[in-house]
Amino acid sequence: MSDSPNVLIIFTDQQRWDSVGVYGSPMNLTPNLDAMARRGVKFDVALTNQPVCAPARACLLTGQYASAHGVWRNGIGLKVGDWTLAHCFKRAGYEVGYIGKWHLAPGECGAGAVPPEYRAGFVDFWEASNVLEFTSKPYDTTLFDADG
């Protein structure tokens, strides 16, 4: 896989397109995102059909509308076995990992670690939390590794 490029998908919540410098913001709020966008691939015409965090993330990961994958509001998890980008990249020989707020496991998972079956194919690296409140403070964040 050494000839294949690295792929990093950064998915921010509730961030307007015009708040990012590479898309025209003069405020210099996102210098690192801007630098990565200039060196990589950025999308100039894109939209989400579900502008709420968990449904939007589920749409991106599955390539489906919320009416197909079932995550039409926060608090609903992806179904175990749903095919995602992680599965596609893994099949192509990539190592796949996830870092950050997950918010796609069912509510009964609670505030602890997300069990492997609810990680939607991210099997090689996991550093995440299913609870928004655990990931909202930049200097006081709780993430769980693969072992919980």
Question: What are the language-model segments listed below?
Answer:
Residues 1-148:
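Formylglycine-dependent sulfatase
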